[in-house]
Amino acid sequence: MKTLWQHCNVASMASGVYSIIEDAAMVTSGAHIEWIGRRSEAPAGDYAQVNDLAGAWVTPGFIDCHTHTVFGGNRSGEFEQRLQGVSYAEIAAAGGGIASTVRATRAATEEELFGSARKRLLSLLRDGVTSVEIKSGYGLDLASERKILRVIRRLGEELPVSVRSTCLAAHALPPEYAERSDAYIEHICSDMLPALAAEGLVDAVDAFCEYLAFSPEQVERVFIAAQQLGLPVKLHAEQLSSLHGSSLAARYHALSADHLEFMTEEDAIAMAASGTVAVLLPGAFYFLRETQQPPMEALRKHGVKIAVASDLNPGTSPALSLRLMLNMACTCFRMTPEEALAGVTLHAAQALGMEKTHGSLEVGKVADFVAWQIDRPADLAYWLGGDLEKRVVRHGVEVTV
């Protein structure tokens, strides 16, 4: 079924820049874009439907390429404690921090996890998100990681959003493996990843490379196991210290390395050579009141593609708005609105290995787009919060969230 969408301006984000088409039109056939260009040049045809977009600015559907949407419990109490002067170490010693989320997630049923994650994901969708990545990592044993990954798959089946599932079993050390991190890494590589991959629950594998998590040597073992299973890898790296995890990620041609506040220029050079995307997470930077910014000039200088994501998680970025992250990327990291928009479209698609089908409005790509009632594309990063008037189209069909 062919549909004509017209009376709009388009920021197609082809090549990662606005690539503006004024007074534009677009033809979709089924779930894909068949033609896009100036309205005066639109092909004549017997369209099943003609949609007037009322002068809207059309962008690709937003892609949130780094989230931890599925978890049990609530850590707003810790937020209060930290603001009253209790340190993160004291909270963790009392059983809080990530350990409390692991306990709550393990205790929750699959149905309970689905219900709470669905609400959070709907908030992202109301912001124009049409594709999302969701990580496991709050189970830290085979049964609980499987439970989370099954919920992630179900979210993609029941909501109007394309979902990529990432296994982050190497997120933290579970209590039953205290002081035995090498043994836990061996369990991930020999038992967890093969079983979960065999069940078709995993699209990519991630790990947390940090002094309070896992060493580069341990992460490399996870990467080798993932590659033996034919799975692409990603990495949380350089958030709190420099371990050159991003260079390790580049060596294994990772889809992305994420956070990166403490990365070096040498890391940026390695990522550029491997095509590894830098995923910046301004929500966590803001929420933790960090002061060390990612090396933006090094990333730009060496041509590293830069994505932006919500990092939605209960401990360090309880962010329910990807559009708010656009503003934070601009204000905290001095990105331009154009760079930030590329960060949640084409470069986010690249961070998920989806750039051939998603992330820009080009012939042959999937027809995921948002028609925004705004004056110019920069408005998407300019307005703080609120619900901008919009129409969301996924796979060529208008959806209501």
From Swiss-Prot:
Which domain of life does the protein's organism represent? Answer: Bacteria
Residue sites binding Fe(3+) per the record: H66, H68, H236, D311
| Top enzyme class | hydrolase
Copy the pathway line from the protein's UniProt record. Answer: Amino-acid degradation; L-histidine degradation into L-glutamate; N-formimidoyl-L-glutamate from L-histidine: step 3/3
Give the binding site residues for N-formimidoyl-L-glutamate: Y138, N313, G315
List the EC numbers from the record.
3.5.2.7
Q: Which cofactor does it need?
A: Zn(2+); Fe(3+)
Q: Which UniProt keywords apply?
A: Cytoplasm, Histidine metabolism, Hydrolase, Iron, Metal-binding, Zinc
Quote the function comment for this protein: Catalyzes the hydrolytic cleavage of the carbon-nitrogen bond in imidazolone-5-propanoate to yield N-formimidoyl-L-glutamate. It is the third step in the universal histidine degradation pathway.
Q: What is this protein called?
A: Imidazolonepropionase
- Natural source organism: Pseudomonas fluorescens (strain ATCC BAA-477 / NRRL B-23932 / Pf-5)
